Amino acid sequence: MKRAICLLLAVVMLLALTACGGKGEKERKVIIPDWLNLESDMPLVKEGTEKTLRVWIRREPTCGPYQESWVYKYMTQVMNVNLEVTEVPGNSMQQQLAMAFASDELPDVMIGFQSYFNASRLTQHGAVDGQLVDITPYLTEKVMPNLYRVYEEFPNYRQAVTDSEGAIYGLGLIMSENYNTTPMTQWINYELLEKVGRKEPQTLDEFLDTMRAIKALDKSMVPIGGGYDTRNGIGMLVLNALGYLTTDPNGLAPAIRNGKVVLPAADKEAFGEYLRVLKTCYDEGLISKDYFTINGDQIGALVAEGKTAFLGGGAWPWQYDKNANENWWGLSPLTSDYNKTKQWPKATSAVTCGGFVITSACPDDMIALACRWADLGYEKHNYNIFNKGPHIEMEKDYMLGVGGWYYNEDLVHQFVDMENNPTKWANLNDYLDAKIHLWYAACWGYFDYDGSEDEIGYYVMNIYPDITGVEDPSIFRDYEPESGALNNVDYFTMAATLEIYPYITFDTYPGNVFLDPDLTEEVADLRTALNTYVRNEVGKFVTGKRALTDAELTKYFSEVNKAGAGRLLEIYVDYYNNLEK
């Protein structure tokens, strides 16, 4: 009913105020223009024709001029697509995109804004407001052959980005079954473990005792890094130790516990213990006294000074510690009195949904071109070159001013520009941002580690050591594979991640939740109120402003239900039960 009212109002406003712009939720005519090349990947636009896409792209100030990036040159000079680029940095992304949709002043395509375009926003801007294009009419073997084949083989990938009415308003990153279990690795500093004579903790109690021992080395230590509003704090580790399968460190997203859908922050079974653990850490100085306000720079400074022994998911220690490859390693899941099974959720980012979107501003005859561009990323080689540039042999005719990459005789990944200018870039990521990338990080495409050794340009899974059952994984910290396609940082992060692989479970709540428009609006309102309430009350419990007693916890759970948790859980349970298994 709400959607019908919205559509009626939109029609009335368009008739009365045509100068205000906005296309509304109109039927888009599917046009496959003659100038679009459907016979091969390149060029996208046939020679002799000029076509321009207006595109907003997330780029950070640390990136070089976009006109100098290899991908920009490849798209414009090889693919024959003119790009009118607007750069949007992450720190203003939310505001800029919100204003663009509110004013209906949109580009044709938006790339790299997956942290903005969650399932709820895709439904709102697409199904409700009519400001995004449903790409399903173009999802054919002729127009989008690469993604079509992926969805044919893995229909669950398509389901993960499809809304309740069968539309797809945004595409994202797909990690294959060979890789999509990659979790948010928890990191522990083994150098500090060795200083206090401890091995890797196996239980939540052992973990806290280990952090206490490290704190005793130096009272200025903050053994547990991160904060409440960052994804590298202790929250996810504790919640999973208590039995909640979740990647949300604050317990505000639906999770699975003992086979049932729960909202951890409203769950009487174990959320009280989560609060007690955080309060213990706060009272004993195991976490920062600024836990609820600390930012990334402050967290990094503590790591760089050697005063932190643990970083949660989403953190990469080498960002802060130049000796990370020697000092840090993955931490396996913990158990507790509330949960006797080591378990860890697969990454919710295995299939994302908002890295590449086409807006209603895109002309009808240009939508197919935008879809063809998006489709390129779902073929392995194209995905590879979009993210690391040209191979010196496979793209020898399209180097476009960069040196390219190759594998040396030991199959070690090498970039020619970095070899020739060893001090010009601090690390590989800086080089890629400066010379290769057009958009910020990998945001759409098919990321498939298939284990092949005969495909140049792809990682080889069998070079990783098998650490299943190894009592002390630190023995692998200095391990150098005899051959392999990983540089040191890649090897370090992937091998450390394997510490958690034996405990991965796929029995998790879906990462993308597409509800009908009415429920999407209701959930957005409920989550806003609930998130504010929970954050405030958790802060009070942890810092001692609210007594952490059984009586106060009873009041809290009553209040949290009144704030909307009960209704929210009902919606999440119904959605989960109605999913196609």
Residue ranges of predicted features:
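Conserved N-terminal structural module of periplasmic/extracytoplasmic solute-binding proteins
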Residues: C6, C20-Y190, E194-E206, L245, ...
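Conserved small-residue motifs centered on glycine
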Residues: E39, R58, N384-N536
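Paired acidic/hydrophobic, glycine-rich loop segments that form the ligand-binding mouth/hinge
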Residues: D108-I111, A309-G313
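Ligand-binding "clamshell"
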Residues: S120-P137, Y320-Q343
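Polar, glycine-rich mid-to-C-terminal structural blocks
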Residues: K279, E326-T335, W344-A361, D365-H437
